[in-house]
Amino acid sequence: MNLRSRLVNATERAVLFQIFKDVQNDPEKYDNAVEAICESIDYFGKFLTDSEYLTQIKPILDTQCPTKSIICFSKCLTKVSTDINTTTFRDVITMLDWLKYVVEKSLTSAICSSLKVKETDVSAVQLYREFASACSNIPEKVSNCCAKALSGEHVKYINTVKWIFKMNLVQGIQKAMLLAHDDIVTAAPFTSFYGSGGPYMKTVAEIISSGRNIDITNKDGLLVQMIEWIGSLNNFDSQWRRMMFLIFQEPTYQGIQVHESLLTTLFLISKSDQILKRCIEATDLTGTLKRVVMVKLPFQRVLKRKTIEILINFVYRTKEQFAIQLLETSVKIWSDLNYAKSAPESQERHIVRMILYLVHLFRTCSSIDWESLFLNSMDGVHCRMSMLPMYVQSGIFVNQALCKQATKHRSKTHGSDEQPPETLEENKFVSSEVGKIWFEEMTSILEHGFNSSTVKDSERVRETANEITKDDSGEEFEETNAQRLQNNKDSAAITSKNNLRLDSDDDEDFPDYQVNESEKIFKNLEIGEEPKNKVTPPAYIADAFEMLLEKEKYEVFEAAFFNITNLINRRPIGFPQIAEKLFIRILHLQNNFGTPKFKETVDEIAVACITQRPEIVPSVVRLIIAPGQGFSIKQRLLHYIHNAADGMGALDKKLEECVMAQQLRIGGPTLSIILHRTINTDYDDEDEDPHRLLVPEWRRMVDARIAANTRRIGTTREPPRAGVVNRLAQAAKYMFYPLLVLPRGENASLLGKDSDLLASLIMVASMVYVRCGVCPQIHRMSSELISYATPHRFSENAKLRTACIIAHLNVTTLLPGDLMDELFDVPALIGWFDWANSVLVNASSSQLEKDMTRQFGHSVTKHLQRYHPAVLQHQDV
């Protein structure tokens, strides 16, 4: 019988202690003891006290291989953190305590022991591959355990375990690299990087490569920490360079894509040429490194100025011919018509900075065909002349810079007397402050490179652009057509009278020209205002979708922009296929033309997309919880979902009139009476109802007499109601359930720094729940909402606690009494009652929290009084 079977079948403490003693005495036989103990902890855990968990298990951990223990903990943490697993939080916290013990004692030594592995030992190589994968996955799996936490203290302890693991991981990698450096120095001879003469560095390289994005601190990841440590090393000799080659330039078993991501991240986080030179020192560009520095970084990313300088300097330092190729490719792409039309402003600035810095580096190089580059750039200038001023300004400047180089090269090769201009002249698009700053930056890059003392910050360009007004018409006043016609009216009449006889060649006088009154009516335009060109609004959603990309003609853009909401509300053919793309495009749409009521219209379009296509809400929720999104954008997206739910759950005005008319014809109660009886349920006596007191006495008497003398057919049956479909209830699986995001894994931050976002999610989910009304799905929706909000009732965040109270209040208010009694048993209701009392007596509770709790407690009390009056005799009501 294996160890796990023995642990599962153990029914007495003595048998269990004997098993632990056998494992401790013969660790080689039970080399998988950690995995067996973790998998069967929910079976034998009931026989051990909290202190025995430590006294009985920790001696076993000391006898086991720490490398295998780390791998086993990584596997078992995945199982115990899921909801379907019956493991209690006591078992989870115990397992985390064991992990913490092993990490503090043996993680550093386990990483260092990987240096002694021989590549010919297949089993050892496979073991340490699994170990590297476990080290990169454990922080995320520890975060998943927060889903089973019962209080804020538990979450803090889980974060402490994760922090201890990260710190020991960094220390272990650094110590292993120091030991490897000493081994390389003493190894003789060191014939190959992975040979028997030197240490085995693949495990360290795999940990750094796969765990490069592990957050060590709030700002820096694992790779950033390692780069800073490498940059601080003294006596960086050839042995260190060999190790850097093994870590950064040799691909691991994880594949080329991971290696490519590692190199890309390395360039993006490098702060200087010296640090990058320590990490990557190459004599040629081949394979993955060539693709990263020649394609991915320069043409698939928008880089900061410092990163552009580091990248180009690296290519220039490695091989000058590749830098020339990079310049030619940049000019070719920049001159392409399709690129010019689709490139945003940030991408345009990025590629212009690259071209100008490359021209700065090669300003004295004669091996470049400057004339060919100049001729290619002419296409880029022509295609930018009808675009925004920044594009025109960049095109003219790049063309002038290449023209200067071509002229200088031509004068040297052909002996021409033509001299290039010493400085580039400002063009007419430099009149604005933004244009001046951009011109100064381009001039500085071309003349001095990326010198921080001379280059203007691009952030300053964006800030200044928002401050500058768009009215640049000047003080000169132009007469409109109507004014010009009025001023010339008298002179034209006098001239016609004086020359009347000269205008006739057949002895007949021409009559005076009379201007019609309709032609005298003109609209006086404001100073600087241009007459608007009318464009027919698009009739198809696909055409409107494409017209939103218009960057030159504002009338085309506005024709689609202001008409697309009407198109969406008609549910056109083809809209389901492009709804999600349209939502994303609208979300990131920029007001390039200064369109009035731009933000309000964007909000209307986004809400219409969700209303007519609720299937996109799961994608919107994924966008909300995605890392890197600003809190304002997340709140904006939640606002869209909330407004769409209001529109889908509300009754249409025309439909409401139709329903009321039908109910009046069939003699049933009107909609207003139904709502009145539903809302005002606190008055047992009809005369005490304040709404009834507003009706005059004579009107009530007349209504009573008419009702007594009116014959109705089928009065014993409930009057039929006109069918009103709640679209929100039908779309609950798209509008409600995706909002219940499980705070685990990548979303574990919802329990910490993003707890405000979790509160907003619960609030919006409860509002959607209320808008769905009493529908067939109300059973499951009520249970899901309560289950989702219950674990956060005692959170440290006041907003999150208030959101949980509101969710419970909405459920108790919306659910009919008999249905609520069926879904929630008496112990659950008593628990709610006690929770409400604890909130009211808590001094740290906010006033809003107490107000909502009073309403919630009143609702629970009324339900107990009606359905379980005996329970209240034992409660302090």
Curated annotation (Swiss-Prot):
The keyword Nucleus applies. The keyword DNA-binding applies. GO terms for molecular function: Hsp90 protein binding; telomeric DNA binding. It is found in: Nucleus; Chromosome, Telomere. It comes from the Eukaryota. It holds the Pfam family Telomere_reg-2. Disulfide bonds: none annotated. GO terms for biological process: 'de novo' cotranslational protein folding; determination of adult lifespan; DNA damage checkpoint signaling; response to UV; response to X-ray; telomere maintenance. Residues 488-501 have a biased composition (Polar residues). GO terms for cellular component: chromosome, telomeric region; cytoplasm; cytosol; nucleus. InterPro entries: TEL2_C_sf, TEL2_Regulation, Telomere_length_regulation_dom. Residues 488-509 are annotated as: Disordered. Keywords: Chromosome, DNA-binding, Nucleus, Telomere. PANTHER family: TELOMERE LENGTH REGULATION PROTEIN TEL2 FAMILY MEMBER, TELOMERE LENGTH REGULATION PROTEIN TEL2 HOMOLOG. DNA damage checkpoint protein required for DNA damage-induced cell cycle arrest and apoptosis, thereby playing a role in genome stability. Regulator of telomere length. Belongs to the TEL2 family. This is Telomere length regulation protein clk-2. The gene is clk-2.
